[in-house]
Regions:
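Short glycine-rich substrate-engagement loop in P-loop NTPases that contacts/grips substrate
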Residues: 67-97
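Accessory nucleic acid-recognition modules appended to NTPase machines
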Residues: 65, 199-356
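Conserved lysine of the Walker
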Residues: 45
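Pre-Walker A adenine-sensing motif
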Residues: 13-32
């Protein structure tokens, strides 16, 4: 790497990070820890680095102490592992002291883990971002030797979305009719919570989402993994969007994709699902009462942001509702989140936290009400003491049935109070 380019970018970025305006995220950093921030493209990882840089400057650090470097800058080409040392040397020639490293999208450089580990061993303070879920894996944690804290980064929560829209909740908001709140929720429900969408005009939001999806699809999936059957990958993602509410086996997905894209083996589907998850586009839940060997092969799949799911569906309301609940629970509870399927199905359960959730657009239909409450009753018998919830679009009540107490709560209220 030409050190002149590195020095130009270092100085340019030091000016930039001081002046960026952002919505402060509800993520705190320990002052003596190193971090790896992992999440979907455009989920706000870079802005978290800016937030942390501004916090450190407010605490007395000089802007010149911060070495922020974006490895996806279009002025950089064909970066190698050795270029990381060149960037470090360029900074030291400029200032003559140790920087605070903020390395954005470093995963595009093969072997970056070794450099990151060496920096930590040499007592540098380091913050790293990446758009590949492999950076969350135990393998990476082992390579980094426990020297970094790994922080998943998600799109805006509904509360953060309201803050970004400058909508504040009045006292006793739970009991008031608030048109601004409801309007903001419906937009968040359909368009999602990617931070940059807040400043995009409404008429262009769907186009912006489509462009980002194409970048993930072509850049992070087709090109990165050398996919030889792009139609199969495209079809698989669409089939996942159409089946958000149902468990899907590898064999069923292989059959569905094969009807469109030619014969696709089950092993290929397993690989493709792993790639899709690695981009942080999709996550999954397992059946808590299935045998261990069956859990992986019959999962439910959800999209990490409702905006992407909206791109695929013509009548998306019920799917978007369950997907949004899944996002919230996944962000809060991670791998503790399951579904329950044993003759009856409960959409989400948190065994360790003694909670179970059904998701229904409306609970007014008598047959639907009987079926879904019956499933919660069956779950309660198997896991006594669980708190039971029904998340709806806009209905609220408390149901007391025999020994059961079930809270029915609108999703917009649940997102702000749970």
């Amino acid at each position: 790497m030409d050190k002149r380019i590195a020095k130009l970018l270092i100085a340019e970025n030091q000016r930039m990070i001081q002046n960026v305006e952002m919505v402060k995220r509800n993520i705190s950093f320990e002052s003596h820890s190193n971090y790896v921030l992992v999440g979907l493209r455009r989920a706000g990882k870079s802005y978290l680095l800016y937030q942390r840089a501004q916090e450190m400057i407010a605490q007395g650090h000089l802007p010149e102490e911060i070495l922020y470097f974006n490895f996806e800058d279009d002025r950089l080409e064909n970066l190698q592992l050795s270029d990381l040392d060149a960037i470090k040397q360029a900074y030291e020639e400029m200032y003559g002291h140790q920087p605070i490293f903020m390395l954005d999208e470093i995963q595009i450089i093969d072997g970056w883990e070794k450099f990151a580990r060496r920096l930590a061993d040499q007592k540098y303070r380091v913050y790293i971002t990446g758009s590949n879920a492999k950076m969350l894996s135990s393998e990476i944690s082992t390579t980094l030797g426990g020297r970094y804290m790994v922080q998943p980064v998600f799109p805006f929560s509904f509360q953060e979305y309201l803050t970004a829209q400058h909508i504040s909740l009045p006292a006793q908001w739970e009991y008031l009719q608030n048109s601004d709140l409801k309007r903001a929720f419906l937009e968040y429900f359909h368009i999602g919570g990617l931070p940059e969408l807040v400043i995009v005009d409404n008429q262009f939001k769907r186009e912006w989402l489509g462009n980002l999806y194409n970048k993930i699809y072509f850049g992070d999936l087709i090109t990165r993994y050398g996919i030889r059957n792009p139609l199969a990958m495209k079809t698989l993602i669409r089939k996942l969007s159409e089946s958000v509410k149902q468990p899907q086996s590898y064999n069923r997905l292989a059959n569905l994709v094969s009807t469109v894209a030619g014969k696709v083996k089950q092993e290929t589907i397993v690989d493709y699902l792993r790639y899709i998850k690695d981009t942080c586009l999709v996550f999954s839940t397992e059946n808590i009462c299935a045998k261990l060997q069956d859990r992986m092969s019959n999962q439910k799949y959800y999209f990490i942001d409702n905006g992407f799911l909206s791109l695929f569906l013509f009548d998306p309301e019920t799917s978007l509702l369950e997907n949004l609940v899944a996002i919230h629970l996944h962000e809060k509870y991670g791998e503790d989140l399951f579904y329950y399927h044993n003759n009856v199905e409960v959409d989400f359960c948190l065994f360790e936290h003694q909670c179970a959730f059904q998701v229904l657009y409306s609970i007014k239909d008598a047959a639907t009400r009987e079926r879904e409450l019956g499933a919660l009753n069956a779950y309660q018998k198997r896991y006594p003491g669980s708190k039971l919830f029904v998340i709806t679009m806009d209905e609220e009540e408390t149901i007391e049935l025999d020994d059961l107490k079930i809270e029915v709560i609108p999703v917009w209220k649940w997102l702000l109070t749970s």
